[in-house]
Amino acid sequence: MESKAEVKADGRTERATAIRAERRAHILESAIRTFSEKGYHQTSIADIVEAAGVARGTFYLYFESKSTVFLALLDELLAHLRANVVGVEVGPGAAPLGAQLLDIVRRVLRTALEKRALADIIFREAIGLDEEVDQKLRAFYGSLHRFLMEALLMGQQGGAVRGTLDVDATASCILGSIKQVLEQYLVHTAERDFDVERFAQAIVQYNLNGVLAR
């Protein structure tokens, strides 16, 4: 049984941990605003510190550099996106493959919309920024490509997808469609309303059914 002193100490530790987490999150949110306004390369640590209203020393308690802030933001976005990519179900009672893919694409697009400012920064600034960022993006897109391939392979095994389909190339096409829609409508035309359902339907219908009348 814990003593009162131990319980009190545990409480202080929990509060300190919560405060640190809140302060770190606040710095990251301030960095998102600053990167959005100025761009990554034009933003300095001083800009982030000023936006966050913290001392420079406080910043360095949480982050080593501007690039580590960017990596933390990238990790946050990728974690949210990964959480929405779930396995495809097969067998009796499972929803049709198209419906399952639609649900996954819909949730990925919705997550990007909810994290729009962050997604905007990643798409505008991440490519070619440094090797670690490139590795993280390659790993994420690679995992999403493998997931799509596996879903199509299961569709072939279940008879929902034709056996002659090149699942590797098709998975790349689906992934490319998602990336292009996000880049075009969340970044380059950010002032437009982004209709998640419209684009999720278009991505899945185009990649699974094509455009020719049947």
Residue locations for each model-derived region?
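Amphipathic alpha-helical packing segments from all-alpha helical-bundle domains
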Residues: 79-86, 111, 131-158, 168-172, ...
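An amphipathic alpha-helix adjacent to DNA-recognition modules
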Residues: 21-29, 41-42, 53, 62-86, ...
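Short, hydrophobic secondary-structure boundary micro-motifs
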Residues: 120-122, 160, 164
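Basic, helix-initiating cap at the start of DNA-binding domains
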Residues: 1-38, 43-54, 68
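Hydrophobic alpha-helical connector segments
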Residues: 72, 86-117, 167, 171-174, ...
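C-terminal peripheral helix-coil segments that are non-catalytic and often amphipathic
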Residues: 1-10, 106-110, 114, 146, ...
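Amphipathic alpha-helical segments used for helix-helix packing
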Residues: 100, 113-132, 180-187
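Amphipathic alpha-helical segments enriched in hydrophobic/aromatic and basic residues
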Residues: 35, 44-45, 55-59, 66, ...
